[in-house]
Amino acid sequence: MLFNINEKGEPLVISFAPFLSPEAIKYLQENERCSDQSQKRTAQQIEAIYTSGQNILVSASAGSGKTFVMVERILDKILRGVSIDRLFISTFTVKAATELRERIENKLYSQIAQTTDFQMKVYLTEQLQSLCQADIGTMDAFAQKVVSRYGYSIGISSQFRIMQDKAEQDVLKQEVFSKLFSEFMNQKEAPVFRALVKNFSGNCKDTSAFRELVYTCYSFSQSTENPKIWLQENFLSAAKTYQRLEDIPDHDIELLLLAMQDTANQLRDVTDMEDYGQLTKAGSRSAKYTKHLTIIEKLSDWVRDFKCLYGKAGLDRLIRDVTGLIPSGNDVTVSKVKYPVFKTLHQKLKQFRHLETILMYQKDCFPLLEQLQDFVLAFSEAYLAVKIQESAFEFSDIAHFAIKILEENTDIRQSYQQHYHEVMVDEYQDNNHMQERLLTLLSNGHNRFMVGDIKQSIYRFRQADPQIFNQKFRDYQKKTEQGKVILLKENFRSQSEVLNVSNAVFSHLMDESVGDALYDEQHQLIAGSHAQTVPYLDRRAQLLLYNSDKDDGNAPSDSEGISFSEVTIVAKEIIKLHNDKGVPFEDITLLVSSRTRNDIISHTFNQYGIPIVTDGGQQNYLKSVEVMVMLDTLRTINNPRNDYALVALLRSPMFAFDEDDLARIALQKDNELDKDCLYDKIQRAVIGRGAHPELIHDTLLGKLNIFLKTLKSWRRYAKLGSLYDLIWKIFNDRFYFDFVASQAKAEQAQANLYALALRANQFEKSGYKGLYRFIKMIDKVLETQNDLADVEVAAPKQAVNLMTIHKSKGLQFPYVFILNCDKRFSMTDIHKSFILNRQHGIGIKYLADIKGLLGETTLNSVKVSMETLPYQLNKQELRLATLSEQMRLLYVAMTRAEKKVYFIGKASKSKSQDITDPKKLGKLLSLALREQLLTFQDWLLAIADIFSTEDLYFDVRFIEDSDLTQESVGRLQTPQLLNPDDLKDNRQSETIARALDMLEAVSQLNANYEAAIHLPTVRTPSQLKVTYEPLLEPIGVDIIEKSSRSLSDFTLPHFSKKAKVEASHIGSALHQLMQVLPLSKPINQQTLLDALRGIDSNEEVKTALDLKKIESFFCDTSLGQFFQTYQKHLYREAPFAILKLDPISQEEYVLRGIIDAYFLFDDHIVLVDYKTDKYKQPIELKKRYQQQLELYAEALTQTYKLPVTKRYLVLMGGGKPEIVEV
């Protein structure tokens, strides 16, 4: 019951319906089942929405509508009188929180519109107003609220900021680490500490490996509910526990004995095969059979009588006996088929071998571990102290502060527990122990609602622990008084082709050992509607493998990057989908394991004209060319005597010094000085006092004067202005921001430069001032091998999506391609020198000196790296955890698809053979085989081979090179009658494009001030040509008339003919060829053909180029011969930018363009421009392009301070090349 006040001040009483009883819920489920609604809620969804008064764990499979359930449950709570601000709702991301809030808002609006009860309308309106203040967000956001409000109770100021930039964190960490390292090196136990550092770094001077160890231990501890207690009590847990053979866990010994018995059973099965050959021709037992029977009997006896024969104390003896008994190989061959009978046992023996020796030396490493524990504890405290001093914290710090506040202040904790009616959490499978502790403190013990899917837990690298979900699942199933488990199995996203293949694959792969969940009936996907079950034969899943038998590179299947052939397979399938089925590009998504090494995808797709967008977020910002140029510019301003930065700045497009210029400058040294920096040489070159002043010609001297004048102004400004203003001054002074707009990926490049200015501004606002400190911070980021995220730019909507599997979680796409299925899982962590585990603590590889054991006397020491017992335990658990997460990644990837899923990989067809698995457990592949297979592709092929008699709902196809030719792949169909890119791509058609633009704006140009408003910041020479010549001169009209078509011109297409090559493409190809053509060789057909291979055009365009005409230009014209004679003076395809004044608006703007060719001499310049326009009389083109060449000449004169004495047009659009002097 809720009270509101009406306009007269009288109380309004709202009576809310009570929460539903179990019987009422069953009644509602039955009504829903019998209803005639087109989309019905499932019985489990109804149960999840309306069950109350107890803890609830909802296990929601992919596409089962978990967000719908959460929204409906929240709305039901509100309608039953629970205010939205009394619900705690945790989401995994800020984006998810925003979407959930929007859905609740829409539901409330809908409910307000439907209700006729005035009092209810008022109440729902209040809920709508309270929605923005409700606790709907991430755990990090909530922790910040708690600390901001109650931080005073633990001595933390409410005025803090979050250090979201990893680079800033690493800079502070490095300072703390260096100081602490010096202290430990000078303490009483310094010898032990030095031994610790050497164990990981090899020597005390190189501390990088030891620093990584400390940082990793610190980060790992931060994911626990109490880092200090974990470091004190759990960090050395395994090191203290496992010191003798008797300490080895019973579970590990059971696994060894199980492997022995399995090997005996498997060997017996093999010997019982008909073709095995138990008897010789004489009828006696064969030697092989006798040997195998001995192995079977002894293994069985040793397993049965382990305790009396060996026991834990005699484990090393058992290992020696078994090693001596079984053969060194893994396989037993029967009828040319190899059965890996001994493989698993060999792996187990390797794990236990040398145990006695390891345990003997393991005790020596314990003092080192105690030193490490002390150092990490001291580092944690010192790092936190620095952050408290700066009042800047990481998210994990804030979460721990929040936990401490709630644990130490009973009244604060109880106020939250009494306030929240329910504590709800989404994506529960991705929680870590710190977050779990916080949720426990907020709950009253019986009001938690948790939604997740163990099969989609893929954030172990963020210390998420799927066992939190698993433990709750088991506890609630065993002890129903603790809570209730509700399974949402119906999938409303995917067609049966996707559901069937997902069920088929994971029913053979996933169990609690690998995957952390048994993929049985509880977890299998079920179609949620009849429409999803309608079969489509063409949507059957495909495993497409490039046959690498003829792969010249012989690249291994575990190579990191995807191959060109694999990408071509994808392109072929996409072209087929787009052309034959009309599938829009935006319906197709490519999923990859990581963001790195995917450039070949974009490059190949560009070749085939397939638009593609990536999910961004790559950590390559500081490595982008434009940012590196600017950073070197700033380094030079800070210290001109930094030769590396200075050379980079001189060579950059801002000043464009070439190798010859730099060589001339480098020779201007002072013979009296041993060391001479480049900046000093530049200054001597300018005043003519270098060692070889005759090498500094007037043009170079002019460039040097401009450079020194510009640098001087920048250095002066750096002392007075802000970093932000300095960066923009550099952009404006040298037009670098405009220059990158003419380069590849211009939008991204400009966004990166803009972000550099913003980040510099943010740096100064955070309390750091000055160019020197900014450069120092950037260099420290690079030293720690970190980077900053690229800036995201707006992406086209109609394009294929390329994203990581992690980024795709929660999304859905009609067609999904899972790429690089042959990429090996990253097992880097299990080979490190240390492995951390929440229960066992740290396990390390110990560098032991076994000189005494070997009786060695001549050598000072004999060092061997030993895997200590804690390390081995952690390694095995980590291996299974890694494989489990990879399996869940595959599940997430496959269940993103709505209609069809493709697997793309690479394998050798000739080397592939049938995979056998005699130890498979019913439907499951054996644990040994699943541990052995290390790619998605391996899993799929193993299932296809071993369960070949089943319908697995996917086909395996090998793709040959002959299937990937240009003709086989095909080309995209373009439905437009006219190519919309014609005007854009044709360098000679800018006149028409600009004229059409001006026709639309002609009325506005009549106003005096409109000219300034519409003046572009940047123009091209072609645009200017249009501005000042008659708008519709006869030539322009003639071109437009020729481009139009009448019905009488229309003819039926002749499909046997090839598509006509566009004139614009030929023009572009000609310019490329003229740019790359080597003029040092005689120009003939062979030279032209060789150069033609290096240009970026398709074969049709290359074939359409008239090479004889180009050869004639160089051989038969004086200008062509001039090119070859003075090639050292020639500059080709040179970009430029100059400042111009608009005559109408009197506003300045930047003029930029690309000059085809010019010859730079000591006292003059010769300008050349190629044109491919069709013409009747050369005089037509001379008039048309006269002003454009004048602009080019003006740009060259401004740059070099030299006159342009000759201007030539090379006309290639006629029957033969013609030269026109303008």
Swiss-Prot record:
GO terms for molecular function: 3'-5' DNA helicase activity; 3'-5' exonuclease activity; ATP binding; ATP hydrolysis activity; double-stranded DNA binding. GO terms for cellular component: cytosol; DNA helicase complex. Residues 524-810 form the UvrD-like helicase C-terminal domain. Coiled coil: none annotated. Residues 39-495 form the UvrD-like helicase ATP-binding domain. It catalyses: Couples ATP hydrolysis with the unwinding of duplex DNA by translocating in the 3'-5' direction; ATP + H2O = ADP + phosphate + H(+). PANTHER family: ATP-DEPENDENT HELICASE_NUCLEASE SUBUNIT A (PTHR11070:SF48), UVRD / RECB / PCRA DNA HELICASE FAMILY MEMBER (PTHR11070). Belongs to the helicase family. AddA subfamily. HAMAP family: AddA (MF_01451). ATP binds at A60, S61, A62, G63, S64, G65, K66, T67. This is ATP-dependent helicase/nuclease subunit A. The keyword Ubl conjugation does not apply. Its EC number is 3.1.-.-, 5.6.2.4. One of its GO terms (biological process) is double-strand break repair via homologous recombination. Its cofactor is Mg(2+). Keywords: ATP-binding, DNA damage, DNA repair, DNA-binding, Exonuclease, Helicase, Hydrolase, Isomerase, Nuclease, Nucleotide-binding. SUPFAM superfamilies: P-loop containing nucleoside triphosphate hydrolases, Restriction endonuclease-like. The keyword Isomerase applies.
